[in-house]
């Protein structure tokens, strides 16, 4: 990643009303993006958003900036991030823009872009947009101004796309599913997809009011889903995050099934069906149990840096078609171009239907290792704790004790002065003790 002023690993994000998530900045961003992206002749930009109240304000600002650059905006209304990627491809638009802060609270928001082929923008294009931001806005002639229109069938188009990734010969008619849409962008999509495929659906987190997105619901907080699955005696639960690019599941016993387990199920099923090409990509945080389970199946496994952007880069580098983060970003390049919670969830449901197995049983081939994470705050500017000899010494001792049946990972937070200490192994008590021993060494620096 180069040093960029505004763009992070997943677009531009922050608290609404604080720079850069302000109406004036976003208007200029729309103009700058329009100047850079007007390359392919369609002069159309798809704009989607999640259910945050600030989405309307930022949508208007973007549209004004794009119009000034001579590009027309096509609004989808509340729509999952992967749906915008899909619609950008099918409309052959210059680009797609998503107004969302994903799993963050309602008072945050962000802007991220998709290129004409439905993938994240290359670094060079983001850098060109930033360079354009330094210039004064110049408006095209009145006759060339962009227009605004709405894609009235956006939801229906995406629902049909999702359903098409589920095998025609299978049905969900025997499954009772609780779906939690985080009061976010999937609220009018996911329940309909599942119902149209035959499932008995109980929907929660499907009443967005602009300020309740991700609030004690969704992929980042599955407690409400776990309780409802047990209360309804459902076969499983499926949770999405606010913009629908993550999925976490819950089995009939209320156990959480994370992105690592979801990828294991999909990869194993792909192998059984003779459809898996190459291996699977996880991250530095992926559970060691995933790596060992895939190894037993003869499926190669590689780790990327944390972040779906880096997972995709590693997949492209190796020519592999499946990758995931344990947080629930699952990328299936045979189906789509980006992480898609609904599509990933459907592949797990297909494995359940095809094999007549419960979600719990599908997970049984993978033993999750206890993974303890301790965050240690340090004083910024006081040197790098990870380079201190005492920290290195304790880390080496722990690694030697764990041997090949465990891992230690120390990494800095990208957003605040925190060291994240992760220790993983077979014995939870031992792993906890080791994690706190390393954390104490970091604190003592």
UniProtKB/Swiss-Prot annotation:
InterPro entries: A-D-PHexomutase_a/b/a-I, A-D-PHexomutase_a/b/a-I/II/III, A-D-PHexomutase_a/b/a-II, A-D-PHexomutase_a/b/a-III, A-D-PHexomutase_C, A-D-PHexomutase_C_sf, A-D-PHexomutase_CS, Alpha-D-phosphohexomutase_SF. The modification Phosphoserine is found at residue 102. Pfam families: PGM_PMM_I, PGM_PMM_II, PGM_PMM_III, PGM_PMM_IV. Binds 1 Mg(2+) ion per subunit. GO terms for biological process: carbohydrate metabolic process; peptidoglycan biosynthetic process; UDP-N-acetylglucosamine biosynthetic process. The keyword Magnesium applies. Its cofactor is Mg(2+). It comes from the Bacteria. Activated by phosphorylation. Its EC number is 5.4.2.10. The active site is at 102 (phosphoserine intermediate). It catalyses: alpha-D-glucosamine 1-phosphate = D-glucosamine 6-phosphate. Mg(2+) binds at residues 102, 241, 243, 245. Keywords: Isomerase, Magnesium, Metal-binding, Phosphoprotein. NCBIfam families: glmM, PRK10887.1. Catalyzes the conversion of glucosamine-6-phosphate to glucosamine-1-phosphate. Belongs to the phosphohexose mutase family. This is Phosphoglucosamine mutase. The lineage of its organism: Bacteria, Pseudomonadati, Pseudomonadota, Gammaproteobacteria, Enterobacterales. The gene is glmM.
């Amino acid at each position: 990643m180069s040093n960029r002023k505004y763009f992070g690993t997943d677009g531009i994000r922050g608290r609404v009303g604080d720079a850069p998530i302000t109406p004036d900045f976003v208007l200029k961003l729309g103009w700058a993006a329009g100047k850079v992206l007007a390359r392919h002749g369609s002069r159309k930009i798809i704009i989607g958003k999640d259910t945050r109240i600030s989405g309307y304000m930022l949508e208007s600002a973007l549209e004004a900036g794009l119009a000034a650059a001579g590009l027309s905006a096509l609004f989808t209304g509340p729509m999952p991030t992967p749906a915008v990627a899909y619609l950008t491809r099918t409309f052959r638009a210059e680009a797609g823009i998503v107004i969302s802060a994903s799993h963050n609270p309602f008072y945050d928001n962000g802007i991220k872009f998709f290129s004409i082929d439905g993938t994240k923008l290359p670094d060079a294009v983001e850098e060109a947009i930033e360079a354009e931001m330094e210039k004064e806005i110049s408006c095209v002639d009145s006759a060339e101004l962009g227009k605004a229109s709405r894609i009235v069938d956006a939801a229906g188009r995406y629902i049909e796309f999702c359903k098409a990734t589920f095998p025609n010969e299978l049905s969900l008619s025997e499954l009772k599913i609780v779906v939690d849409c985080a009061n976010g962008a999937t609220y009018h999509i996911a329940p309909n997809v599942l119902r149209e495929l035959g499932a008995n659906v109980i929907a929660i987190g499907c009443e967005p009011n602009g300020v309740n997105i991700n609030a004690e619901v969704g992929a980042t907080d599955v407690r409400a889903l776990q309780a409802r699955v047990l209360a309804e005696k459902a076969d499983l639960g499926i949770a999405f995050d606010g913009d629908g690019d993550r999925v976490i599941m819950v089995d009939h016993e209320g156990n959480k099934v994370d992105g690592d387990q979801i990828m294991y199920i999909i990869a194993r099923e792909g192998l059984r069906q003779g459809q898996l090409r190459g291996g699977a990509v996880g991250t530095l945080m992926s559970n060691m149990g995933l790596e060992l389970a895939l190894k037993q199946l003869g499926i190669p496994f590689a780790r990327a840096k944390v972040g779906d952007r880096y997972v995709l880069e590693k997949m492209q580098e190796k020519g592999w078609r499946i990758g995931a983060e344990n947080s629930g970003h699952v990328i299936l390049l045979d189906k789509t171009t980006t992480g898609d919670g609904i599509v990933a969830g459907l592949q797990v449901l297909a494995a359940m239907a095809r094999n007549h197995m419960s979600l719990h049983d599908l997970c049984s081939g993978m033993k999750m290792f206890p993974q303890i994470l301790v965050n240690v705050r340090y004083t910024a500017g006081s040197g790098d704790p990870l380079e201190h000899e005492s920290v290195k010494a304790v880390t080496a001792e722990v690694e030697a004790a764990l041997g090949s049946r465990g891992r230690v990972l120390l990494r800095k937070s990208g957003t605040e002065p925190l060291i994240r200490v992760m220790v993983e192994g077979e014995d939870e008590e031992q792993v906890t003790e080791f994690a706190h021993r390393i954390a104490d060494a970091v604190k003592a620096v």
